[in-house]
């Protein structure tokens, strides 16, 4: 019985240490989440401004584009970032974390992405994958799926400079017709307890509404020309959309980490409670047995 008591005490002590670690990790993730939510809010302000400017600049092109037959879009009359072309190959940017301890965050993304790819494509020649996050890159490679480009080791609050190369690579691959459309697959941050899997079309750019341009009484003086400005601004806008998805995904990752560590801490506390009850019962049994032995010994001496 004594050995059993010592074993239970050791398990209680080790579980308490684990609980302290998971509690600390929960607090760290909560701090990261707060910071990421602030960064996401700031980015939304920037995104709204650049979207407004781009909408004004391409309003005329978009109006014509929507009235033009699909077959005429390959003649070069429209900017490559706007014109839809026949889809021979699809590009996917899949955003996951580099590490674990984030609950079902990664499994949700990868499971639904694989399901979508298998449903929409008959062979791996019909799509190209770009992986942001080591978990996703390793997942695809382990299944014999080629990863065209990957990025690992993002910081907790990624700057655009950190992701510039992979974002620019993705837009350049589209412009060079390596693939004909580009989607980003990631978990969207809803709140601290909830995230939602999203597949957002980034290229060609389709989220601009010409009617929004007429809602602002603004005029732009364009130098050297609207076309030259669009050549610079449209890729930048597309890159900002991808960067926004990365920030959103990182925020969801921190929320998932915080939730996972809270669950781990709560589970540890439940285990400690159960072990404490077991310890008290074992201790009570040991005391009862000792009393019984003493009484029996005293009776034998009479």
From Swiss-Prot:
It is a peripheral membrane protein. One of its GO terms (biological process) is proton motive force-driven plasma membrane ATP synthesis. Its main location: membrane. InterPro entries: ATP_synth_F1_ATPase_gsu, ATP_synth_F1_gsu, ATP_synth_F1_gsu_CS. PROSITE patterns: ATPASE_GAMMA. The keyword Ion transport applies. CDD domains: F1-ATPase_gamma. GO terms for cellular component: plasma membrane; proton-transporting ATP synthase complex. F-type ATPases have 2 components, CF(1) - the catalytic core - and CF(0) - the membrane proton channel. CF(1) has five subunits: alpha(3), beta(3), gamma(1), delta(1), epsilon(1). CF(0) has three main subunits: a, b and c. This is ATP synthase gamma chain. It comes from Enterococcus faecalis (strain ATCC 700802 / V583). The gene is atpG.
């Amino acid at each position: 019985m004594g050995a059993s008591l010592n074993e239970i005490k050791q398990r209680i002590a080790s579980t308490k240490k684990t609980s302290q670690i998971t509690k600390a990790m929960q607090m760290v993730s909560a701090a990261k989440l707060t910071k990421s939510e602030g960064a996401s809010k700031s980015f939304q302000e920037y995104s709204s401004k650049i979207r407004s400017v781009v909408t004004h600049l391409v309003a005329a092109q978009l109006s014509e584009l929507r009235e033009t037959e699909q077959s005429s879009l390959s003649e070069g009359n429209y900017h490559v970032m706007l014109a839809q072309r026949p889809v021979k190959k699809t590009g996917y940017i899949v955003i996951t974390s580099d590490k674990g301890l984030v609950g079902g965050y990664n499994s949700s993304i990868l499971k639904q992405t694989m399901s979508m790819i298998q449903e929409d494509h008959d062979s791996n020649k019909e799509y190209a994958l770009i992986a942001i996050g080591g978990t996703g890159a390793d997942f695809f490679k382990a299944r014999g799926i080629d990863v065209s480009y990957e990025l690992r080791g993002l910081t907790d609050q990624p700057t655009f400079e950190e992701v510039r190369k992979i974002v620019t690579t993705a837009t350049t691959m589209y412009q060079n017709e390596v693939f004909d459309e580009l989607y980003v697959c990631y978990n969207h941050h809803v709140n601290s307890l909830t995230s939602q899997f999203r597949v957002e079309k980034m290229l060609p750019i389709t989220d601009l509404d010409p009617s929004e341009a007429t809602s602002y009484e603004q005029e732009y003086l364009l130098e050297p020309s609207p076309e030259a400005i669009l050549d610079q601004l449209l890729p930048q806008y597309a890159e900002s959309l991808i960067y926004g998805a990365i920030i959103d995904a990182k925020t969801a990752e921190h929320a998932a980490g915080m939730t996972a560590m809270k669950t781990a801490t709560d589970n540890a506390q439940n285990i400690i409670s159960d072990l404490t009850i077991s310890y008290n019962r074992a201790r009570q049994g040991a005391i009862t047995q000792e009393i019984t032995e003493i009484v029996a010994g005293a009776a034998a001496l009479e």
